[in-house]
Structure formats: C-alpha cells, structure tokens
Swiss-Prot record:
Subcellular location field: Secreted, Cell wall
Role according to the record: Acts in the modification of cell walls via demethylesterification of cell wall pectin.
UniProt-annotated stretches for the region Pectinesterase 38: 164-461
Designated name of the protein: Putative pectinesterase/pectinesterase inhibitor 38
Catalysed reaction equations from the record: [(1->4)-alpha-D-galacturonosyl methyl ester](n) + n H2O = [(1->4)-alpha-D-galacturonosyl](n) + n methanol + n H(+)
GO biological process annotation, one example: pectin catabolic process
Predominant place of localization: secreted
Region span, Pectinesterase inhibitor 38: 1-130
Signal sequence, renumbered to the chain: none
Note: The PMEI region may act as an autoinhibitory domain and prevent untimely PME activity during transport.
EC number: 3.1.1.11
Disulphides: 308-328
Entry keyword set: Aspartyl esterase, Cell wall, Cell wall biogenesis/degradation, Disulfide bond, Glycoprotein, Hydrolase, Secreted
Length: 474
C-alpha cells in the first residue's frame, strides 16, 4: 500500500484518496492505481444516486430531484466508460474528458441542491473522489502513459446516403413530430451506424430530447429559418435552467445541421435555454440557436459548432463543455438591464479539460437591433477556473474596451484563463483590457495552438467522419 499512499499524497485530497483505497490489495503500478480509483469512484456514484433517491421529500421540488437523479445516471455512465477504457482501447484524453463531465454533472446537481437548502454527504464524497481521479489521470497523461488509440468510429451521412426516417407535419413522412422519430430510433450503442432523421420545413412546437442511450443520431433540416424547433420554457415560468431547453442532446456523437432552435420566452423570463448539449463528440453545423439569457448551454463533453448563428443577451453561451465555435456568427440582442455577457464558462477544477473557444467568427449586434447605451462584454467567470479564448475573430464596436467583466468573484480573477489572439475589428483592441492576472493577450503561437481543434477537443479521433468542414490550424 506504500505505492498507493505516495500517489495519494499528490492528489488534492490525500486523506480521502487513502480511505478510498485502503481495502484494496497493494497497488503496484500507476495504471492499476488509476483503475482502482475509477472503480471505487464508480461505486461511490452508485451509492450517491441511491442516497439521493431517498432525499426526494427534502428537495421540495420534484423537478430538481429528477434533475439530480438524471445527472447521477449520466455520471455513472461516464465513469463506466472510464472503467472500461483499457478494454475498449481508448485514450487518456478520453478518460479526462469523461471525468471532467462527471464532475460537471455533480456540480450542476450541487447547485440545484444548494438553492433548495438540501445537503448530501455522499455527493460531497463522490465529488472529492472524482477530483482526485482527475488529478491521477492528468499526471499519467502528462507522463505519456496511454491505454491506446481510440478505435471508436462515428459512421456518418455523406452525400447520397440514405435518410432513415422523415419527419413532416403534413403526414407525408414517417413521423409528424421529431421526438417520435428520435424514440423510433431506439437505443443505439456507441459505434453503431449513424441514424439520420430528416425534418422537413415547418415550425415544430415541441421539446426534443435525444437521450443518453441514443448515440449517433443526426437530425438534419431544410435550412436555417426553414426547419424550426421552438419552445418557451424558462426560469421565470418555473423551470430550472437545466430543464428549460427546447432541444436537448445527450447521446454521444449527435449531429445537428440545417435547423433553427429557439426559446421564445423573452428577456423578461430570465434563464431560458434554446439548446443544451451534454453529448460528447457532438457537432452542430449551419444551425441557428436563438434566445435571450442562457441561449446555448454547452453543458459538458466535447462539442463543435461550425457556421452557426447564436443570438442572446446575458451569458448566452455558457456551461462547462470543451466547446469550439468556428466560423460562427454571434449576435447580441437588447438585454433587460443594459449589460450583455456573451460567455459564462464554468470550469471549476484546474484538471478539467473544458472551456469555450471562439475561432474565426464574428461578434456583432443582431440585425435591426440598436445597442446604444448597452455594455457588451466577451464574458464573465461563472466558476473559479473559467476558461474562454477568442481567436482570429472579428469583434464589432459593441465590445467594451475592457473586454471582460467580473462576477463578484475576486479569487477567480487570478485562477481563470481568458485569452485573446489576433482578433480584428473595432472592438478587438487590447490596450484597455482588464488587468486581471488570469487575462492573457496571447503572443506565443504555441500557447494559441493549445486551443485548436486537435489539441482542445481531440478532434482527429472523431470529427473527420462527420463530413463537416473544419479548420485544424489557427
């Protein structure tokens, strides 16, 4: 057990690490140490979910309780993937991404519980275990110890391939609603062929959920402004931010293209999500995502947005995914309080491989919107290790000279990472930017390359088969 003790001493919570491993046979290698840590963490997640099941009366909100139960299920799913990694020949970066997601799930649940005054020792315990396991895997990743190269292949639509089902409101397709088509696909394993749902032109007033067991689903429409999915759930109408989304993608390998997703609750109803994605290795291509506060919830996983339009006001690109927005147009609308914040990234552990990268895009006011008197910022830190980088992007006059704004969190100003690299436009000047320790005007090209697709979301292993165009360099 001496070897395990030494490894535990290098984790953020050594005492809990040693307690976790104390009943295990002697640890003889770093690989075995990681495997034991992940397995014990998985056991803890199963127990925490069971404990939370019996906490329903304390929640006082069935919606919040169901949200936590769902997040525990997703956490168990990600930890299972990590446990099976050696058998499936995946990479350390895969494991780090899945552990980052598990920790994000727990944080989302914790936030709901804190608002309701509910406490859970098992939630606190499993959070510490995931934090420790993240640190262990990060150390091994830095030392170059790999399980192998990912062999998961995402089979996808290319020109001329057959669409599986068609959705049409007039009855000319296989289904009249999108959710019926998703349900008709059934459970689909990772690595299964892409299941393609074509949604014909129309306004679909429904809430769509592509669940965690629905992997490799593609939903393709007839174009932005033609195939429209719309809803109006919001915080102001009694829904949590997490549950307010018009469209939810949870199954891995999701692809959405040529569709519009809207939340029409309006700025007076506060948080109102149009799209929430928890889908690892997900892609959105030529989509319009429209709302006001909290429009695009990049909750967790590795995500890529290409040639998308995103509309909003306050924190309208937010969450803790590893998300890259490339060749996108980001439109600020009129906010209710005179302040727009484009991003609110919520990385809260330095070992999480998460952040928001805006690359080769355009940030400007929405068409027809007058932003006189409105202050617009590139972002604010939702959590202490928030990470947002803007690269090669056109920033219009709406961006305030100081660029970024605080969230009443003085500590975060030194631990966050906000970066700008070779942007253009009247709002791109950095001479009057914030003087925080965590803000960087990036001058080193090697530092900037850390936020390219291959480095930041491990794109080489999964993005090319989607047939979506992308740029791998700066």
């Amino acid at each position: 057990m001496v070897f395990g003790n030494e490894m535990c001493d290098e984790t953020p919570h050594p005492g809990e690490c040693k307690t976790l491993l104390i009943k295990h046979k002697p640890i003889r290698s770093t690989t075995q140490f990681l495997q034991v840590s992940v397995e014990r963490t998985l056991d803890g997640a199963v127990k925490a979910k069971s404990d939370t099941y019996f906490l329903e009366p304390q929640f006082g909100s069935k919606q919040a309780w169901e949200e936590c139960m769902d997040l525990y299920e997703q956490t168990i799913h990600r930890l299972n993937e990590s446990v099976l990694c050696p058998k499936n020949v995946c990479s350390r970066s895969d494991v780090q991404a899945w552990l980052s997601t598990a920790l994000t799930n727990l944080d989302t649940c914790q936030e709901e519980m804190s608002e309701l005054g509910v406490s859970s020792h098992s939630l606190e315990s499993i959070t510490i275990d995931v934090i420790n396991t993240l640190a262990i895997n990060k150390r091994m990743e830095q030392n170059g110890k790999e399980f192998g190269i990912s062999k998961i292949t995402m089979k996808t639509l290319s020109i001329g391939e057959k669409v599986d089902v068609v959705v049409a409101q007039d009855g000319s397709g296989d289904y009249k609603t999108i959710q019926e088509a998703v349900n008709g696909a059934g459970e689909r394993l990772k690595g299964s062929p892409r299941y393609v749902i074509h949604v014909k032109q129309g306004v679909y007033e429904e809430y769509v959920n592509v669940g965690i067991k629905s992997n490799n689903i593609m939903i393709t429409g007839d174009g932005i402004g033609k195939t429209i999915i719309t809803g109006d759930k919001s915080k102001g109408r009694g829904f949590s931010t997490y549950k307010s989304a018009t469209f939810v993608a949870e199954g891995d390998g999701f692809v959405g293209r040529d569709i519009t997703i809207r939340n029409t609750a309006g700025p007076e109803n506060h948080q109102a999500v149009a799209l929430r994605s928890n889908s690892d290795m997900s892609v959105f291509y030529r989509c319009s995502i429209e709302g006001y506060q909290d429009t695009l919830y990049v909750h967790s996983g590795r995500q890529f947005f290409r040639e998308c339009d995103i509309y909003g006001t306050v924190d309208f690109i937010f969450g803790n995914a590893a998300a890259v927005l490339q060749n996108c147009r980001i439109f600020a609308r009129n906010p209710p309080n005179g302040v727009n914040t484009i991003t609110a990234q919520s990385r809260f552990n330095p070992n999480q491989t998460t952040g928001i990268v805006i690359h080769n895009s355009v940030v400007k006011g929405a068409p027809g919107v007058q932003l006189g008197g409105v202050k617009t910022y590139l972002g604010r830190p939702w959590r202490s290790y928030a990470r947002t980088v803007v690269i090669g992007t056109y920033l219009d006059t709406l961006i305030e000279p100081n660029g970024w704004i605080d969230w009443d969190n003085v500590t975060a100003l030194s631990t966050l990472y906000y970066g700008e690299y070779q942007n253009s436009g009247p709002g791109s000047g950095t001479e009057n930017r914030v003087d925080w320790a965590g803000f960087h005007v990036i001058s080193d090209i090697q530092e900037a390359r850390e936020f390219t697709l291959p480095k930041f979301i491990d794109s080489a292993s999964w993005l090319p088969p989607t047939k979506v165009p992308f740029t791998i360099n700066l």
